[in-house]
Amino acid sequence: MTAKIFKRYQEAFLFCVCACIDLLEKIREKEYQKTRRFKHNITTLAANILQEIYKLVSQDELLKGPKQLERIKEIIHSNSDEAGLTFLKILKNANLMKAEFDVYEIFNLDSPYLDFANHPAHKIILLTINPFWLEFIEKKIYINIDSFSDTIYADYKTISVTLCHIFENATKYIAKNTELHIYFTSDDNYINIIFEMVSLKVYEDEIQKIFLENYSGILAKEYDLAGNGLGMYIVKKLVEFNNGKITFLNNCNGTAFKYDGIEYEKIK
């Protein structure tokens, strides 16, 4: 082998090595970002739970040794309404924490295990919306869930996580003193679950973008309501895992308007 040919092989080898190193760095950075995001979300939710507990029962009360149990019972008994609200808030954050673990596990497995079975669509909605009642009540939202007796063939865990993210978004973006209408239709082999509400306006050219990873809406960012841009991305992925699809319709019936200086519209 001549020196010239050897040099070419050497250059090609070095190029491949550099490309591999660059690829590995990108993979490492992506995995680090996912882990950091997961850790941040779990830490935030855990902090929310502790905050709600300490608002009801102060840390000083928890330092009373053997008497702490009796004292906690007294506080709950004398503040039953507040205790009930605390329970709902803890339940919501615990559900969101479970959803975070489920999503992290599913998205990091090459072939996630999905347990498909028939589940009553109406019951799944009721079970999943329960932890969010309080926030809807605080915003004076009238929740109208139509009756429906059909079942959906789906993986319960991923569908529950999907609905969790939908309701979490709804509590953030729905306009006060309005209605959340959830109804069902049957279409060939599909069951359609439709969420209709007056929500923060989404511009026409954003409709497809809201399903992209790390994308937050223009007005969501402007009004400081944006999350981490994962909610609808996760929803779309999990719906597709269940052989379904999701669509977003904005400005239904030409209902765009302003409330408290914020732009809203009816969406489905």
Q: Which residues does each predicted region cover?
A:
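Short helix-loop "hinge" at the ATP-lid/N-box region of the Bergerat-fold HATPase_c
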Residues: 169-171
